[in-house]
Amino acid sequence: MQNQKHSHILTAITIVLLFAMAAKINAIDVHDAMCYRSECTSVCDQICLSHGYTNGWYCGTFRLHTGCCCLKKKELNQIISPSKN
């Protein structure tokens, strides 16, 4: 009886984790872009603008899917790297 209880708890935890992972699968954060699963057409421009990205986009391949990758704004310290002398 105790084993069944532990089995049910483990199953519930697994299901919750799978739902959490599935919710995040539509957007993937890469270093300089945020990618969304969609067709790579002019709709990418609308997707990026609706999420607040104004620096353009490109078609990317990720997790065996193709999608719109919206370019992030770079911070000033990322654009200009200090010289190390």
UniProtKB/Swiss-Prot annotation:
Any Gene Ontology CC annotation: extracellular region
Cellular compartments annotated: Secreted
GO BP field: defense response to fungus; killing of cells of another organism
Keywords, in A-Z order: Antimicrobial, Disulfide bond, Fungicide, Plant defense, Secreted, Signal
Signal peptide: 1-27
Major subcellular location class: secreted
Cystine residue pairs: 35-70, 40-59, 44-68, 48-69
Family statement drawn from the similarity comment of this UniProt entry: Belongs to the DEFL family.
Identification of the protein by name: Defensin-like protein 76
Source organism (scientific name): Arabidopsis thaliana (Mouse-ear cress)
